[in-house]
Amino acid sequence: MNSSSSTMNEEPDALSVVNQLRDLAADPLNRRAIVQDQGCLPGLILFMDHPNPPVVHSALLALRYLAECRANREKMKGELGMMLSLQNVIQKTTTPGETKLLASEIYDILQSSNLADGDSFNEMNSRRRKAQFFLGTTNKRAKTVVLHIDGLDDTSRRNLCEEALLKIKGVISFTFQMAVQRCVVRIRSDLKAEALASAIASTKVMKAQQVVKSESGEEMLVPFQDAPVEVEENTELPDYLPEDESPTKEQDKAVSRVGSHPEGGASWLSTAANFLSRSFYW
C-alpha cells in the first residue's frame, strides 16, 4: 500500500517528464540548454532503459531533436552510457521496429559527428538501410507538415488536438510549440495534409493552416479547403508508425526562426532535472 501511494504522489511521472523534454527539444532554441543541463541528458539516457515502451520512444524522439544541433553532438556522444544505451535499444529483440530505426538514426548521427560531411552522409545512409531491415519492405517515406492552429492556446485544447491526430492512420509523431500555436507533424507520404486539418476542425474549437515557405524564403500561412476530407482512422491506437527520413526539413527550420520562450523552457528544465535526480538513485 505504501509503495502504491508513494507512486501516486510522485509528480510528475516518467512519461510526462520525458514528453515535456521531447516537446522542449522540438524547439531549436532550447536544444543547447537541455544538453548543457546536468540532469536532463543523463535522465534521457536512463529513460532508454525504461520498461514502458512509450517512455523509451519519447526519449529517443527528444534525443533525435537534440542531435539535430551540430554543437550538441560531441557532448552527447561522450555522455556516459549514451552510445551503449542506443546499441542496447537497437539490439534488444523486444524493441519495436520503428524504435530500432529511430535509435539507429541517432547512433549514426553521433557516431559520424567527427567524420567529414560526405563520409558522414554515406555512412548514415548505409546504417539506415541496415536498420530498415527490421521494418521489412512496407515502410514508406515520411514527410513533415507544419501547422499553425488557431485556438491552440491551452492544455485542454492541446489534449483535444492530440486525440484528433492520434486517430489518423498514417500519423507518425507530432510535437507542439504552444507559444506560437504550431504543431510539427510527421506523416506518411501517402497521407494528405488536408486530413490533419479535417481532424483538427472536427474539434469544433480549432482550425489549422499549413505553414509553407515562399520562393523568397518567407513563411506563409496557407488555408485548407473548408470541405471536410474523409480521414482513415485507427481502429485502435498503435505505437507510432515507422518513419523514414523526411524530405521537408526546411519547414522545421522555418519554425525555428519564430521565437518561442526559451526562458520558460529553461525554468522547466530545473523541475525536470530535480525529478530525474530524485527518481534514478536506487
Curated annotation (Swiss-Prot):
The keyword RNA-binding does not apply. Residues 239-261 are annotated as: Disordered. Its main location: cytoplasm. It comes from Mus musculus. One of its GO terms (molecular function) is metal ion binding. One of its GO terms (biological process) is intracellular distribution of mitochondria. ARM repeats lie at residues 39-81. This is Armadillo repeat-containing protein 1. Interacts with mitochondrial contact site and cristae organizing system (MICOS) complex components IMMT/MIC60 and MICOS10/MIC10. Interacts with mitochondrial outer membrane sorting assembly machinery (SAM) complex components SAMM50 and MTX1. It is found in: Cytoplasm; Mitochondrion; Mitochondrion outer membrane.
